[in-house]
């Protein structure tokens, strides 16, 4: 890495209501140095608990809470669980393709997902320009893993940051009425992609044990969590 982690400039946001845990406040540390905006540097930053939103690189830095733990899957060591194998079997008619751009009909699917699953979230109401600001960056390769059914109908898109040694599951949206767990299938297909491309790690963002919606991440073995600046698991 071209910049020593101990000497990067960090800015702290003000405290504001936590997006995941009611009655708590969150604060994030933001990396301010623009020279960090490279693939090599970002891989090191992710290994130290950072993540991005648009071009902003950040990590949780809350005063009275450490519930957010970075989590990643060791791709060569991944072994699907029995339930994941059943899901793969049920979804064997589906197929995926990693693309550099979104399919033209992506926004209809994204809108349905936001309206039915996240109407009370920060992405509501769904807007194309807001989605672009959230997902796009000028210094990193981002792919869009499209999942289709047997008739080539678009079911899901897993936005994926792609680097030399790892990938990062950035954001996924899907058909909220489809009977299979497309969120879990999205990660399984991202793992297939990582295995094919010889990536060492798939980062899943932050795990919050007290947030039930996030606990699917812990079902992927072997995973590691960053606790007290050491990867464990």
Swiss-Prot record:
Enumerate the catalysed reactions: N-terminal L-glutamyl-[protein] + L-leucyl-tRNA(Leu) = N-terminal L-leucyl-L-glutamyl-[protein] + tRNA(Leu) + H(+); N-terminal L-aspartyl-[protein] + L-leucyl-tRNA(Leu) = N-terminal L-leucyl-L-aspartyl-[protein] + tRNA(Leu) + H(+)
Q: Which GO terms describe its molecular function?
A: arginyl-tRNA--protein transferase activity; leucyl-tRNA--protein transferase activity
Q: What is its EC number?
A: 2.3.2.29
Q: Where does this protein reside within or beyond the cell?
A: Cytoplasm
Q: Which UniProt keywords apply?
A: Acyltransferase, Cytoplasm, Transferase
Cellular component annotations (GO), alphabetically ordered? cytoplasm
tRNA processing: is it a keyword of this entry? no
Q: Which Pfam families match?
A: ATE_C, ATE_N
Grouped into one coarse class, the protein's main location is cytoplasm
Q: By its UniProt entry, which PANTHER family does this protein fall under?
A: ARGININE-TRNA-PROTEIN TRANSFERASE 1 (PTHR21367), ARGINYL-TRNA--PROTEIN TRANSFERASE 1 (PTHR21367:SF1)
Task: Indicate what this protein is called per its UniProt record.
Answer: Aspartate/glutamate leucyltransferase
What organism is this sequence from?
Answer: Vibrio campbellii (strain ATCC BAA-1116)
Gene, per the UniProt record: bpt
